[in-house]
Amino acid sequence: MTVTACKNNCLPFTTKLRKRLENTTYTHIRRNVTGYGVGMHCIDIDLIVNTPEKRKEFREEIMDSPVFCFHGVEVPVINERVGRNHIRGIHIRPEYPVFSTKAPHATFILSNHSGGDLTCGEHYYLTFEDEKGTWRELPINAAFWDIAYVLRDGEERVMKASLYPDVHPNKPGRYRYFYEITIRRKPVLMMAEFRLTDNEEEWRTAEKTSLPPLYFGCREGREPTIDNGRANGRTGL
């Protein structure tokens, strides 16, 4: 099939597919889809988790066609990279040390007591430790708005990371949140480690984390203010 023929034949399918996804009650299947469109020879469908089971589920519950080509991760890729949880008066931490395995998201706090500004964006990624002790990337929707924020000295920024428990079951264990910031035009990869648990009492009774004494109120006895993101008008870092 030529590219032109593919476009002519596939466009009606994309319209039908869009309506099926919008109207489905299987929200977990819809959330597994990060994008779709007419490619060179087929309709490309991008999935967070691209296993045979997920493809079968999509074809049975949403729509099936021989022109569908699925893309995405089938086995989480190995990523044993590490970052910093503090540097020059800048600190990152999870809001709680532990979250439920069924939690839709985890929250993190970036504190700036560096004496100057830093910039940050929306992009993040997560890793988890598997049963063999290997760190792998947690499948998520990696599409983010390309926007930059300025975090002033003495301010904090609260970020949410989606965990997608409805797309893939998250197991109890250790996880890492990675978030890049820019200090004086130099990128720095920050990292905060946290846990997921299926013990309801453990995550319900978990206390909020606090800024280490070294950082708390370190400038003129002033406590940090909360800033959920002040856009600086730039389109990227």
What are the residue ranges of the model-derived segments?
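Short, solvent-exposed, Trp/other aromatic-anchored flexible loops in extracytoplasmic proteins
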Residues: 140-184
